Design a protein with these regions (language model features):
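Short, hinge-like loop/turn segments at secondary-structure boundaries
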Residues: 62-65, 136-138, 164-166
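Rossmann-fold NAD(P)-binding glycine/threonine-rich loop
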Residues: 98-113, 121-162
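N-terminal glycine-/serine-/threonine-rich beta1-alpha1-beta2 phosphate-ribose binding loop
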Residues: 3-113
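A secondary-structure boundary/capping signal
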Residues: 15, 120-121
Length: 174
């Protein structure tokens, strides 16, 4: 942030359902205001479902997102991590908006490879204490954060979304 250079945050979003799609749309709509008001450049660099991904190290455009079915390629989590490393991406946040028990197994390799975690998936916190303990130890070892929020109403994580919108300059009313 020296000399007014914005901080780039690279987002990898896992899940394209109702919650994931809404989150992606909100990010596209709010990121110009977030850049202007907070000097944070949010870039979605990957959008994935359980089997396929669209990746662009420079950032995915709304048009790329709309063309997901045309641009998607099969992937494994290790390949996606390798792509991120190949392009030397920093300030990585993996966002899990799946409801998948299987996807939670990717949390440890993501953290070990430089990702902070944000999740609307409740499973990691309820899968069992041994996994939760290992996740917390790995987060501490790699100095990473794990933020999570359960869903309400129409299935959208509310508190952090409201905070983000407020910080981007939106007026919140009852």
């Amino acid at each position: 942030e020296i000399f007014q250079i914005s901080k780039r945050i690279n987002l990898v979003i896992f899940g394209r359902g109702t919650v994931g799609g809404t989150l992606i749309e909100q990010i596209f709509q709010a990121r110009a205001d977030i850049l202007k008001r907070r000097n944070i450049n949010l870039q979605i660099v990957a959008i994935a479902n359980s089997k396929e991904v669209v990746f662009n190290h420079k950032g995915i455009s709304p048009a790329d997102y709309t063309a997901f079915d045309t641009l998607k390629v099969p992937y494994q989590i290790s390949e996606l991590i390798a792509q991120v490393q190949q392009h030397h991406l920093e300030n990585l946040i993996a966002i899990d908006v799946t409801a998948s028990k299987a996807f939670v197994e990717n949390y440890l390799p993501l953290v070990e490879n430089g990702f902070d975690l944000v999740s609307a998936n409740k499973i990691a916190n309820t899968i069992g204490y041994p996994f939760y303990k290992k996740l917390r130890e790995t987060l501490t070892q790699y100095k990473k954060q794990y933020l999570y929020e359960t869903n309400v109403g129409a299935g959208l994580p509310l508190i952090d979304t409201i905070k983000l919108l407020h910080h981007s300059g939106e007026n919140i009313t009852r």
